[in-house]
Amino acid sequence: GPEKTILGGEQWAWLEQTLKDSDATFKLYISPTPVVGPDRKTKNDNHSNATYAHEGRRLRELLSSTRGAFVINGDRHWQYHSIDATTGLNEFGCGPASDAHAGGWKPGNRLPEHQFLRVAGGFMSVQISATKMTLQTHDVSGQVVYEHLIEAAADGE
């Protein structure tokens, strides 16, 4: 229910104020766990699952209403890019650092929110300029396996 929280009141207040005050073109919300997901139904430790559904909805709404905000997640054992169907919030999962630790999601189980799905190891890199941001997902040898470009929103958007 609404009383369940991962962030707590003090962190919520800080996050809301920081996002409001920021004049950065791009705002990276880096989370140890998914905000958009999807995640396995058996998990109950993050904002993409039913256990924290109320706070997850609130967080997705806050981030999606903040120009230039998106999520990078580090604790799923697969690489992905998902877009929340309700809010349009983008989330990028960097996956495990090694192929040996990949798993927990079936490679063929690509859901509608998945823009990219790869059950393997690697890392992410992000290049940011004043007008665009490029996120790249790499395999363990450093080869780019996925790239996504986000352009800065024009004033009034």
Region spans (language model):
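Metal-dependent phosphoester/phosphodiester hydrolase catalytic core
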Residues: G1-E157
